Amino acid sequence: GMLVESVLFENSPVSYKHEKNALFIDLPKSFGKNAIATFVVIYRGVPADGLRIGNTRHGERSFFNENWPNRTRHWLPTVDHPYDKATNEFIITAPSHYQVISNGLLVEESIINANQKLTHWKQSVPISSWLYVLGVARFAVQYVDEFMGKQIQTWVYPQDRDKGFFDFVSPTKEVLGFYSNYVGPFAYEKLANIQSPSVGGGMETASAIFYGENLVNGKRDVRLRNVVIHEIAHQWFGNAVTESTWDDAWLSEGFATYFTMLFQEYAYGTSVYVDELKKARTRILNFYNKDSTYKIIDNRTAEEGPVTNDMTYQKGAWVLHMLREKMGHEVFKEGIRAYYQKFYNKNVTTDDFFAEMQKFTKAPLSTFRNQWLHHPEVLNLQVAWRYDSASSQVEITIDQKQSTGFYFEAPVEIEIVESTDKKIISLDISGRTSTFKIKADKKPVALLADPRTTLLAKFEIRVL
């Protein structure tokens, strides 16, 4: 662990206590409200966590942080919680054969002597502690392009230079453009894609994103492409607009997952978007089969256990998808833009999000929010139908089969397939059983549930 040697205020030592992973400082004088004071903490040691000191896949020594969710405290004195956002600087002295990457803009890079180099990075945009970034290794660095006057960079191991430069050049700029147009301005001074041994997938560290070293293979495959899209989405959601508590982590991970899907819809077509929704729905149902009690919002903290899982990511994304369908695509977009603008570089709660979105629709959102975020149940529907030739009607009965006794209010889309035609109808369900009668001149060939993939539910169709 780390040993604190001294704490200074105005170059004079002050008394302190370092115990139970917390640093308590005796203030040397009284400070008024909103006063700014600077303390210097001098400490040393080998971090127990949070800063990975080890080899790259090529056997070279390296130093990379792994802060998520609350491990920054193991190597930096910080308020290690999402609600505390601060600007940051890293001034690093390292052996001269290393390159150093961090948040923000490069202020200085100077040779100190034959063996050492000083590198100074400074970020002027406030961020939460898990988003601080430090990577020290041998790198090949490419200045790929610019976006709105801000550099796009690639940092990869020199052994992977050609592969990494190829992998990261696309779709980075296109993704930045899409999110800027859909949501609002990119908050940071640069965007660097960085190969790292400290993550398996990606980590959205602000302005300088880590990607698992083994994702770099020179094939620009779908796996890496989707991680790039997801981590760049975090620069808007999670980074610029940051959850106030761990319990609101879906505002980061659910949003990044869904906005990955929105970019896929934009860039690769509706079929890819729908496929991603279906895969997400399968993961949600599988998770629910293993744990039927997990609520997206449930007073959890990083100190007590994991704050994210498939419900945070995939169900969070589905909540946004259903909200977009409920509000209408353009109205949803207007609400998202207003939400981002209001909480740009600030902290936010689920209450804040729904209060902002409610301004853009007359339909009350309280029931929607409550059933999808504050309840663990997954909608389980049995759709039974028969054709009554005497009345020329299709009789449809929709039963909610949840065993807990909690029932959703939701629109269920049904496609009625006839021999020469088909049509989609929307049926509003509530309570255990809902029944409907639909005019039809002849018996349908089939009825299909949720043909447009708009509802998070498990479906069973029965013909009576």
Predicted features, each with a name:
Residues R223-W236, W250:
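Short alpha-helical catalytic segment bearing the HExxH-like zincin motif
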Residues M2-G59, N115, R432-K443:
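A surface-exposed beta-strand-loop module
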Residues E66-N70, T78-I229, Y258-M261:
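Hydrophobic helix-coil surface modules that form long, contiguous segments used
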Residues K33, I42-E89, F139-V144, T453-L464:
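Glycine/proline-rich low-complexity spacer/linker segments in large multi-domain proteins
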Residues E253-W318, M322, K326, F343:
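Acidic/His/Gly-enriched intrinsically disordered linker/tail segments
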Residues A267, N309-I396:
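Amphipathic alpha-helical substructures
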Residues I232-D247, L262:
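Catalytic Zn2+-binding segment of zinc metalloproteases
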Residues V4-L8, I101, L365-S366, L379-L381, ...:
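Beta-strand-rich binding/interaction modules
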